[in-house]
Amino acid sequence: MKSSTMSPMYAAIDLGSNSFHMLVVRHINGSVQTMAKIKRKVRLAAGLNENNTLSHEAMQRGWDCLSLFAERLQDIPVENIRIVGTATLRVASNVDIFLEKANQILGHNINVIEGEEEARMIYQGVAHTSGGNGRRLVVDIGGASTELIIGEGFEAQALTSLKMGCVTWLEGYFKDRALTQKNFNAAIAGAKETLAPILQQYTDLGWQTCVGASGTVQALQEIMLAQGMDEVITLAKLKRLQKQAMQYEHLEELDIDGLTLERALVFPSGLSILIAIFELLNIDSMTLAGGALREGLCYGMIDELQHDEVCQRTIKSTQQRYQLDVDYAQQVTDLSIQLVQQCGNDWLIEPQALPLLTAATQLHEIGMCIDYKKGGEHSAYLINALDLPGFTRAQKHLLGELLRRYREYFSAMPTQHAVSDISAQRMLRILRLAIILTHRRDVNLAPTVTLSEKNDVLSLSIDGAWLAANPLTRSELEIEADKQTNIGWELVIDARD
């Protein structure tokens, strides 16, 4: 049976200090689609002794894992494969013994990369999969090293790899497995001491947003969501989780809502490192990145994706995949932007609100690929279910709720954490108006309108003669005015003479 050749496949393998990961993707419609993610907990760093000699047992765990990965690599062109080793393999004195057998198992050579190169590839993975403007701080806490990067767009401006990680900090500060204040204090202090040499450089550069790109950060976010918190990580939430952990005497007893058994062993050490980073760098908040080292390796093999804006690339790929009417989507987008600008540049409070509104206008008909009758419901489902690089979970939730309400179904927006409640309300009002005004799907047939706002009362001024000649649009606008007004969002339709 022939293997599929419909689009090129790529694979990246990361031999981390805590886990080995394999990512398989394909390049399709100008975007990257994940085909497989394989992870095995190897805890390679735990096999290092005081002389940095890797134990045979740890090496065997690694070889056993690579034997599994080798099967999948057989299906992928050699030139589309990247395999890297990180912190533990950088320091292991007997690394050659491990690599000789590992290379034989895989049929490919492993490249042990330096810490700065690891940081560079992590940043590329973040830049290609995470949205946001301005300068950002990226934090990746691994098993034996922690990378911190400041960059903007696709350019990294500061790259650091520090010799601390959740496995090494576990052995260094929680060796007795006691979840005491003393152990936490020592672990946090040790992390701050390790961070101190870079403090001045990083605070001088500064950043607008902070993202975490590691299993540690992902695990913490999952715990917060399981406990009813939002996805934004703050120091107060980290301290809250520390208090929860300290209610248990020993690590083996740890049972926090949302914490998986797989992550429990390195939870206190990873948490301590992140608390130290928050406190020393005075970080307000952190969100989870869409990718890191493995994604950076994959995107680095695909030349045409090197400098595309992430969110726009995602939108374009999704439009192609679901055969959306791109010209009409752009008409709705242009009118939405015009209506927002008429209400004032600061009417949508957060800077990310307008880009999110334009994403909604570009994708609002996606649910119609399933069924017209429940198009909004299907749109919401797809937006939340799809992998959309550049958009956080909270942003996908907001987009889904906007698109659920873009047509017949109408209600106030539910609680969400991507923008303020008032901005979400205003985004929905604009979206619905823009769709009604463009329903003939021809820019030459759309009316000239002026939208004004005072105390959240919207007044839509439109030519009376045009309304008389387009009775369906007039009727839909009148119905929309009633709907918005009935839930407290007053909308007035003003027919100009």
UniProtKB/Swiss-Prot annotation:
It comes from the Bacteria. Keywords: Hydrolase. The keyword Transmembrane does not apply. Its EC number is 3.6.1.40. Pathway: Purine metabolism; ppGpp biosynthesis; ppGpp from GTP: step 2/2. One of its GO terms (biological process) is guanosine tetraphosphate biosynthetic process. The keyword Hydrolase applies. Pfam families: Ppx-GppA, Ppx-GppA_III. It catalyses: guanosine 3'-diphosphate 5'-triphosphate + H2O = guanosine 3',5'-bis(diphosphate) + phosphate + H(+). Belongs to the GppA/Ppx family. GppA subfamily. This is Guanosine-5'-triphosphate,3'-diphosphate pyrophosphatase. It comes from Aliivibrio fischeri (strain ATCC 700601 / ES114).
